[in-house]
Amino acid sequence: MSDTMPEIVSPLVAENSQEQEESVLISLDIEEDKLFLLHFIIGTYFGPDLRKQHHRPKQSAFQIQALKNVVVDELSGSLMKRAELERVYYHIIRNVDPSLVMKPKKLREYFNAKRNDSNRDYPLFVDLFPRKLHPETHVRHKFKFIRSIVFINDPDTSCMREECVARFKRLTGLDSFALSLSVDVTKSNGVVAANEVKVEIDESVEPVKEDNAGTCTSGEESDVAAKPEVKSEAHGGLMVGLMDIGECDDAYLFRVSLPGVKRDERYFSCEVEDNGKVLVRGVTTTGGKRVKRYSHVFEMQTRSLCPPGNFSVSFRLPGPVHPHEFSGNFGTDGILEGVVMKNLQKQTV
Protein backbone atom coordinates (compact mmCIF):
# COMPACT_ATOMS: atom_id res chain seq x y z
CA MET A 1 0.00 0.00 0.00
CA SER A 2 1.07 3.55 -0.55
CA ASP A 3 2.84 5.59 2.10
CA THR A 4 -0.27 7.72 2.62
CA MET A 5 -2.15 4.87 4.26
CA PRO A 6 -0.15 3.81 7.34
CA GLU A 7 -3.22 3.52 9.52
CA ILE A 8 -5.04 1.01 7.29
CA VAL A 9 -2.28 -1.47 6.51
CA SER A 10 0.49 -1.80 9.06
CA PRO A 11 3.52 -3.98 8.30
CA LEU A 12 4.78 -5.57 11.51
CA VAL A 13 8.43 -6.60 11.26
CA ALA A 14 9.46 -9.50 13.47
CA GLU A 15 12.80 -9.41 15.27
CA ASN A 16 15.38 -11.43 13.38
CA SER A 17 19.10 -11.61 13.20
CA GLN A 18 20.81 -9.56 10.51
CA GLU A 19 21.55 -12.73 8.55
CA GLN A 20 17.86 -13.66 8.31
CA GLU A 21 15.33 -12.12 5.97
CA GLU A 22 12.81 -9.88 7.70
CA SER A 23 9.41 -11.46 8.34
CA VAL A 24 6.58 -9.04 7.66
CA LEU A 25 2.96 -9.48 8.72
CA ILE A 26 0.12 -7.38 7.35
CA SER A 27 -2.43 -5.88 9.73
CA LEU A 28 -5.66 -4.33 8.43
CA ASP A 29 -6.66 -1.56 10.83
CA ILE A 30 -10.14 -1.06 9.36
CA GLU A 31 -12.83 -0.47 11.96
CA GLU A 32 -15.92 -1.02 9.80
CA ASP A 33 -16.51 -4.73 9.21
CA LYS A 34 -17.89 -4.49 5.67
CA LEU A 35 -14.92 -2.38 4.54
CA PHE A 36 -12.57 -4.84 6.19
CA LEU A 37 -14.22 -7.76 4.37
CA LEU A 38 -14.07 -6.06 0.97
CA HIS A 39 -10.42 -5.04 1.27
CA PHE A 40 -9.39 -8.38 2.77
CA ILE A 41 -11.09 -10.34 -0.02
CA ILE A 42 -9.59 -8.27 -2.86
CA GLY A 43 -6.11 -8.27 -1.33
CA THR A 44 -6.16 -11.98 -0.47
CA TYR A 45 -7.87 -13.60 -3.44
CA PHE A 46 -6.23 -11.43 -6.10
CA GLY A 47 -2.65 -10.48 -6.79
CA PRO A 48 -0.38 -9.09 -9.50
CA ASP A 49 -0.11 -11.43 -12.49
CA LEU A 50 3.66 -11.82 -12.53
CA ARG A 51 5.79 -13.30 -15.25
CA LYS A 52 6.80 -16.77 -14.14
CA GLN A 53 10.47 -16.20 -14.81
CA HIS A 54 10.58 -13.42 -12.20
CA HIS A 55 8.52 -14.84 -9.34
CA ARG A 56 6.59 -17.91 -8.41
CA PRO A 57 3.05 -17.37 -9.72
CA LYS A 58 -0.07 -16.41 -7.82
CA GLN A 59 1.06 -14.32 -4.89
CA SER A 60 -1.68 -12.20 -3.35
CA ALA A 61 -1.52 -8.41 -3.22
CA PHE A 62 -0.85 -8.62 0.52
CA GLN A 63 1.97 -11.12 -0.01
CA ILE A 64 3.59 -8.81 -2.54
CA GLN A 65 3.28 -5.88 -0.14
CA ALA A 66 4.99 -7.88 2.56
CA LEU A 67 7.90 -8.80 0.29
CA LYS A 68 8.76 -6.10 -2.23
CA ASN A 69 7.53 -3.55 -4.73
CA VAL A 70 6.58 -4.69 -8.23
CA VAL A 71 7.70 -2.96 -11.43
CA VAL A 72 5.91 -2.96 -14.79
CA ASP A 73 8.41 -5.28 -16.47
CA GLU A 74 7.52 -8.03 -13.99
CA LEU A 75 3.83 -8.02 -14.96
CA SER A 76 2.27 -10.31 -17.56
CA GLY A 77 -0.06 -7.80 -19.24
CA SER A 78 -3.10 -10.11 -18.95
CA LEU A 79 -6.60 -8.64 -18.65
CA MET A 80 -9.43 -9.45 -16.26
CA LYS A 81 -12.96 -8.05 -16.26
CA ARG A 82 -13.60 -5.97 -13.18
CA ALA A 83 -16.93 -7.74 -12.89
CA GLU A 84 -14.99 -10.93 -12.12
CA LEU A 85 -13.52 -9.34 -8.98
CA GLU A 86 -16.98 -8.27 -7.89
CA ARG A 87 -18.33 -11.75 -8.60
CA VAL A 88 -15.74 -13.33 -6.30
CA TYR A 89 -16.53 -10.75 -3.60
CA TYR A 90 -20.27 -11.46 -3.74
CA HIS A 91 -19.67 -15.21 -3.79
CA ILE A 92 -17.62 -15.11 -0.59
CA ILE A 93 -20.09 -12.91 1.31
CA ARG A 94 -23.21 -14.69 0.03
CA ASN A 95 -24.12 -15.96 3.52
CA VAL A 96 -23.03 -13.02 5.68
CA ASP A 97 -25.32 -10.68 7.58
CA PRO A 98 -26.89 -8.20 5.10
CA SER A 99 -25.37 -5.29 7.02
CA LEU A 100 -21.92 -6.52 5.96
CA VAL A 101 -22.64 -6.33 2.22
CA MET A 102 -21.26 -3.29 0.41
CA LYS A 103 -23.89 -1.35 -1.52
CA PRO A 104 -23.24 -1.09 -5.30
CA LYS A 105 -22.51 2.65 -5.13
CA LYS A 106 -19.92 2.22 -2.37
CA LEU A 107 -18.42 -0.76 -4.16
CA ARG A 108 -18.02 1.36 -7.29
CA GLU A 109 -16.35 4.11 -5.22
CA TYR A 110 -13.92 1.55 -3.81
CA PHE A 111 -12.79 0.54 -7.30
CA ASN A 112 -12.88 3.98 -8.94
CA ALA A 113 -11.71 6.47 -6.32
CA LYS A 114 -8.25 8.01 -6.28
CA ARG A 115 -6.28 8.53 -3.10
CA ASN A 116 -6.51 12.01 -1.57
CA ASP A 117 -6.70 13.67 1.85
CA SER A 118 -10.49 13.35 2.06
CA ASN A 119 -10.41 9.54 1.87
CA ARG A 120 -7.16 8.97 3.72
CA ASP A 121 -8.77 6.57 6.20
CA TYR A 122 -10.79 4.68 3.58
CA PRO A 123 -9.29 1.54 1.96
CA LEU A 124 -9.25 1.67 -1.83
CA PHE A 125 -8.54 -0.71 -4.67
CA VAL A 126 -5.62 1.46 -5.85
CA ASP A 127 -3.85 0.83 -2.55
CA LEU A 128 -3.51 -2.81 -3.59
CA PHE A 129 -3.27 -2.38 -7.36
CA PRO A 130 -1.85 1.04 -8.32
CA ARG A 131 -3.18 2.45 -11.60
CA LYS A 132 0.32 2.89 -13.04
CA LEU A 133 0.82 -0.89 -12.77
CA HIS A 134 -2.76 -2.05 -13.28
CA PRO A 135 -4.52 0.42 -15.60
CA GLU A 136 -8.13 -0.06 -16.67
CA THR A 137 -8.99 -0.81 -20.29
CA HIS A 138 -12.44 -0.13 -21.76
CA VAL A 139 -13.78 -2.20 -24.66
CA ARG A 140 -16.75 -0.88 -26.65
CA HIS A 141 -17.44 1.41 -23.68
CA LYS A 142 -19.11 -1.56 -22.02
CA PHE A 143 -16.45 -3.66 -20.37
CA LYS A 144 -13.87 -2.63 -17.81
CA PHE A 145 -10.73 -4.73 -17.82
CA ILE A 146 -7.91 -4.43 -15.29
CA ARG A 147 -4.42 -5.27 -16.45
CA SER A 148 -2.12 -7.86 -14.87
CA ILE A 149 -4.33 -9.27 -12.11
CA VAL A 150 -4.67 -12.95 -11.23
CA PHE A 151 -7.28 -14.81 -9.17
CA ILE A 152 -6.09 -17.12 -6.37
CA ASN A 153 -8.67 -19.74 -5.43
CA ASP A 154 -6.68 -21.11 -2.47
CA PRO A 155 -4.65 -18.17 -1.12
CA ASP A 156 -1.78 -18.31 1.35
CA THR A 157 -2.63 -16.09 4.35
CA SER A 158 0.61 -16.58 6.24
CA CYS A 159 1.51 -12.93 5.62
CA MET A 160 -1.57 -11.76 7.56
CA ARG A 161 -1.81 -11.32 11.32
CA GLU A 162 -3.80 -14.06 13.02
CA GLU A 163 -6.44 -11.65 14.30
CA CYS A 164 -7.17 -10.51 10.71
CA VAL A 165 -7.64 -14.09 9.54
CA ALA A 166 -9.83 -14.89 12.54
CA ARG A 167 -11.95 -11.80 11.93
CA PHE A 168 -12.53 -12.79 8.30
CA LYS A 169 -13.61 -16.30 9.29
CA ARG A 170 -15.89 -14.99 12.03
CA LEU A 171 -17.65 -12.54 9.72
CA THR A 172 -18.05 -14.91 6.77
CA GLY A 173 -18.55 -18.17 8.65
CA LEU A 174 -15.95 -19.81 6.39
CA ASP A 175 -13.46 -22.28 7.83
CA SER A 176 -11.35 -22.57 4.69
CA PHE A 177 -10.04 -20.03 2.19
CA ALA A 178 -10.30 -22.44 -0.75
CA LEU A 179 -12.94 -21.58 -3.38
CA SER A 180 -14.36 -23.74 -6.17
CA LEU A 181 -14.48 -20.85 -8.62
CA SER A 182 -12.84 -20.08 -11.93
CA VAL A 183 -12.20 -16.60 -13.30
CA ASP A 184 -11.69 -15.65 -16.94
CA VAL A 185 -8.37 -14.00 -17.80
CA THR A 186 -7.51 -12.72 -21.28
CA LYS A 187 -3.89 -12.94 -22.33
CA SER A 188 -2.86 -9.78 -24.10
CA ASN A 189 0.04 -8.18 -25.89
CA GLY A 190 -1.26 -4.82 -24.78
CA VAL A 191 -4.14 -4.59 -27.30
CA VAL A 192 -7.61 -6.08 -26.89
CA ALA A 193 -9.70 -6.70 -29.97
CA ALA A 194 -13.42 -6.18 -29.50
CA ASN A 195 -14.26 -9.48 -31.16
CA GLU A 196 -12.07 -11.28 -28.61
CA VAL A 197 -14.18 -9.97 -25.79
CA LYS A 198 -17.80 -10.01 -26.81
CA VAL A 199 -18.04 -13.39 -28.49
CA GLU A 200 -21.01 -14.68 -26.52
CA ILE A 201 -23.73 -12.51 -28.08
CA ASP A 202 -25.28 -13.56 -31.37
CA GLU A 203 -27.31 -10.63 -32.72
CA SER A 204 -29.15 -12.97 -35.09
CA VAL A 205 -31.18 -14.42 -32.22
CA GLU A 206 -34.78 -13.20 -32.40
CA PRO A 207 -37.06 -13.34 -29.34
CA VAL A 208 -40.24 -15.38 -29.38
CA LYS A 209 -43.61 -14.02 -28.35
CA GLU A 210 -44.02 -13.10 -24.72
CA ASP A 211 -46.81 -15.67 -24.29
CA ASN A 212 -44.09 -18.32 -24.20
CA ALA A 213 -41.92 -16.57 -21.64
CA GLY A 214 -40.54 -18.99 -19.11
CA THR A 215 -40.96 -22.15 -21.19
CA CYS A 216 -38.26 -24.27 -22.76
CA THR A 217 -38.99 -25.77 -26.17
CA SER A 218 -37.54 -28.90 -27.71
CA GLY A 219 -35.76 -27.17 -30.58
CA GLU A 220 -32.06 -26.68 -31.01
CA GLU A 221 -32.24 -23.34 -29.23
CA SER A 222 -35.04 -21.61 -27.34
CA ASP A 223 -35.20 -17.90 -26.62
CA VAL A 224 -37.21 -16.25 -23.87
CA ALA A 225 -38.10 -12.58 -24.09
CA ALA A 226 -39.92 -10.72 -21.33
CA LYS A 227 -40.67 -7.27 -20.08
CA PRO A 228 -40.09 -6.84 -16.34
CA GLU A 229 -43.79 -7.17 -15.57
CA VAL A 230 -44.43 -10.31 -17.67
CA LYS A 231 -45.08 -13.58 -15.79
CA SER A 232 -44.95 -17.09 -17.16
CA GLU A 233 -48.19 -18.73 -18.29
CA ALA A 234 -46.58 -22.16 -18.60
CA HIS A 235 -47.46 -25.11 -16.39
CA GLY A 236 -45.64 -28.25 -15.35
CA GLY A 237 -41.98 -29.12 -15.01
CA LEU A 238 -38.99 -26.98 -14.25
CA MET A 239 -38.88 -23.92 -16.50
CA VAL A 240 -35.85 -21.98 -17.67
CA GLY A 241 -36.19 -18.23 -17.68
CA LEU A 242 -38.63 -17.40 -14.88
CA MET A 243 -37.42 -14.08 -13.55
CA ASP A 244 -37.80 -11.22 -11.12
CA ILE A 245 -36.46 -7.66 -11.34
CA GLY A 246 -35.84 -5.24 -8.49
CA GLU A 247 -34.92 -1.57 -8.44
CA CYS A 248 -33.35 0.91 -6.03
CA ASP A 249 -32.23 4.51 -6.47
CA ASP A 250 -29.07 3.75 -8.46
CA ALA A 251 -29.19 0.09 -9.54
CA TYR A 252 -31.26 -2.79 -10.87
CA LEU A 253 -31.22 -6.34 -9.54
CA PHE A 254 -32.46 -9.30 -11.56
CA ARG A 255 -32.87 -12.96 -10.74
CA VAL A 256 -33.36 -15.63 -13.38
CA SER A 257 -34.29 -19.24 -12.68
CA LEU A 258 -32.00 -21.59 -14.65
CA PRO A 259 -32.66 -25.14 -13.40
CA GLY A 260 -30.54 -27.79 -15.03
CA VAL A 261 -28.24 -25.26 -16.72
CA LYS A 262 -24.53 -26.05 -16.83
CA ARG A 263 -22.59 -23.56 -14.64
CA ASP A 264 -19.31 -24.04 -16.51
CA GLU A 265 -18.26 -20.61 -17.80
CA ARG A 266 -17.11 -22.14 -21.07
CA TYR A 267 -20.77 -22.76 -21.91
CA PHE A 268 -22.53 -20.00 -19.98
CA SER A 269 -22.60 -16.24 -20.53
CA CYS A 270 -24.58 -13.23 -19.34
CA GLU A 271 -24.17 -9.91 -21.13
CA VAL A 272 -25.77 -6.55 -20.35
CA GLU A 273 -26.11 -3.77 -22.93
CA ASP A 274 -26.28 -0.05 -22.20
CA ASN A 275 -29.97 0.11 -23.19
CA GLY A 276 -30.81 -2.37 -20.43
CA LYS A 277 -31.06 -5.49 -22.58
CA VAL A 278 -29.83 -8.65 -20.85
CA LEU A 279 -28.94 -11.78 -22.81
CA VAL A 280 -28.25 -15.07 -21.04
CA ARG A 281 -27.03 -18.05 -23.03
CA GLY A 282 -26.07 -21.53 -21.96
CA VAL A 283 -26.65 -25.26 -22.15
CA THR A 284 -29.25 -27.35 -20.33
CA THR A 285 -28.27 -30.84 -19.20
CA THR A 286 -31.66 -32.20 -18.07
CA GLY A 287 -34.60 -33.73 -19.92
CA GLY A 288 -32.77 -36.48 -21.79
CA LYS A 289 -34.39 -39.74 -22.86
CA ARG A 290 -31.78 -41.81 -21.05
CA VAL A 291 -29.69 -41.11 -17.95
CA LYS A 292 -26.60 -43.13 -17.04
CA ARG A 293 -25.79 -43.45 -13.33
CA TYR A 294 -23.48 -45.92 -11.60
CA SER A 295 -23.27 -48.33 -14.57
CA HIS A 296 -27.08 -48.26 -14.92
CA VAL A 297 -29.06 -46.80 -17.81
CA PHE A 298 -32.43 -45.30 -16.86
CA GLU A 299 -35.21 -44.74 -19.39
CA MET A 300 -36.90 -41.49 -18.37
CA GLN A 301 -40.71 -41.63 -18.30
CA THR A 302 -42.39 -38.27 -17.67
CA ARG A 303 -39.71 -36.10 -19.29
CA SER A 304 -41.21 -32.80 -18.11
CA LEU A 305 -37.81 -31.13 -17.68
CA CYS A 306 -36.31 -28.88 -20.34
CA PRO A 307 -34.68 -30.97 -23.07
CA PRO A 308 -30.88 -30.86 -23.29
CA GLY A 309 -29.33 -28.35 -25.65
CA ASN A 310 -28.57 -24.69 -26.16
CA PHE A 311 -30.88 -21.98 -24.90
CA SER A 312 -31.00 -18.21 -24.54
CA VAL A 313 -33.00 -15.91 -22.30
CA SER A 314 -33.37 -12.22 -23.14
CA PHE A 315 -35.19 -9.42 -21.37
CA ARG A 316 -34.92 -5.69 -20.90
CA LEU A 317 -34.42 -3.78 -17.66
CA PRO A 318 -36.63 -0.72 -17.01
CA GLY A 319 -33.96 1.79 -18.05
CA PRO A 320 -30.42 2.39 -19.39
CA VAL A 321 -27.48 1.05 -17.40
CA HIS A 322 -23.69 1.04 -17.15
CA PRO A 323 -22.77 -2.43 -18.52
CA HIS A 324 -19.23 -2.20 -17.13
CA GLU A 325 -20.75 -1.74 -13.66
CA PHE A 326 -22.37 -5.18 -13.72
CA SER A 327 -21.68 -8.04 -11.33
CA GLY A 328 -23.41 -11.40 -11.32
CA ASN A 329 -23.39 -14.77 -9.63
CA PHE A 330 -24.82 -18.07 -10.88
CA GLY A 331 -25.37 -20.07 -7.70
CA THR A 332 -25.62 -23.79 -7.09
CA ASP A 333 -29.34 -23.24 -6.42
CA GLY A 334 -29.83 -22.58 -10.15
CA ILE A 335 -30.53 -18.88 -9.70
CA LEU A 336 -28.60 -16.28 -11.70
CA GLU A 337 -28.50 -13.01 -9.77
CA GLY A 338 -27.11 -9.81 -11.25
CA VAL A 339 -26.73 -6.21 -10.09
CA VAL A 340 -26.07 -3.41 -12.58
CA MET A 341 -25.79 0.32 -11.96
CA LYS A 342 -28.28 2.66 -13.62
CA ASN A 343 -27.13 5.21 -16.18
CA LEU A 344 -28.84 8.14 -14.47
CA GLN A 345 -27.49 10.68 -16.97
CA LYS A 346 -29.31 9.01 -19.87
CA GLN A 347 -32.49 8.67 -17.83
CA THR A 348 -32.63 12.41 -17.16
CA VAL A 349 -31.93 13.46 -20.75
From Swiss-Prot:
Cellular component terms (Gene Ontology): nucleoplasm; nucleus
Phenotypic effect of disruption: No visible growth or developmental defects under normal growth conditions. DNA hypermethylation.
Tissue specificity as recorded in UniProt: Expressed in cotyledons and hypocotyls in young seedlings.
Effect of D49E: Loss of function
Disordered: annotated span: 210-230
InterPro entries named in the record: A-crystallin/Hsp20_dom, HSP20-like_chaperone, IDM2/3-like
Subcellular location: Nucleus, Nucleoplasm
Impact upon substituting G276E: In idm2-3; DNA hypermethylation and loss of transgenes transcriptional silencing
Domain of life: Eukaryota
Induction note: Not regulated by heat.
Keywords on record: Nucleus, Stress response, Transcription, Transcription regulation
Effect after changing G246D: Loss of function, but no effect on the oligomer formation
Domain sHSP: 233-349
Assembly mode: Homodimer or oligomer. May form an 16-mer complex. Interacts with MBD7 (via C-terminus). Interacts with IDM1 (via N-terminus). Interacts with IMD3. Part of a complex made of MBD7, IDM1, IDM2, IDM3 and ROS1.
Family of the protein in this entry: Belongs to the small heat shock protein (HSP20) family.
Cited function: Prevents DNA hypermethylation and transcriptional silencing of transgenes and of some endogenous genes. May act as a molecular chaperone of IDM1, regulating its H3K18 acetylation activity.
Protein's recorded name: Increased DNA methylation 2
Primary gene name: IDM2
